Amino acid sequence: LVLVTGTIPLLESEQDVQCLFVAMALQFRILLVNGQTKMAEPYIKKIRERIQRGGRDELESSLDALECRAALYGGNMERIEAWLEYQAPDENKELYMMDMYAYLIKIRCYLLNGKHMMAIVLAKRLINLIEPVNRYMDLCECYMLSAMACYKAKDNKRLCEELQKALDLAKQYGYYRLLADE
């Protein structure tokens, strides 16, 4: 947290909005993981203002998804449903790499709402999109979320297959924290 927090002023001075977004999102996520949901909520406003000032509207979708992730941690079903209905990207249309974070949050929402098959289908679509371009961290996360959906759907064979793929990627690239955070 200290490293991320210390980097933010440097990134602001360089006006690198994309890297600043990542640093602020990491700080936000650390607050969530540490159970500081109330402290994290006003942080979204600060991130949104910085994005708008920097003219990087393409980051809005990821920021909206980050807000939804806070709602997932806080159990705010009303906010989750609103995000799914009005802000989440539509996976039935063409998938966009820039919305990857939002798609991954959408899978988590599907899992929470008991829509296991929708979670599996979206995970598979994402895997087909990111596997050819070697986005291994996203791939690992997709396999893990797919394994979770298979578990919920009581499909033990596919659960083991998906989990093994996630574990293999985690081992190869050191993504242990990614799996542990879920």
Predicted regions and their residues:
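Alpha-solenoid helical repeat architecture
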Residues: 1, 11-26, 38-39, 51-67, ...
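Tetratricopeptide repeat
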Residues: 3-7, 40-47, 80-87, 119, ...
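Short, charge-rich, low-complexity alpha-helical interaction segments
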Residues: 73-79, 117-118
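Strand-loop-strand
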Residues: 146, 150-166, 171-182
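Extracellular beta-rich repeat passengers
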Residues: 84, 105-107, 111-116, 120-123, ...
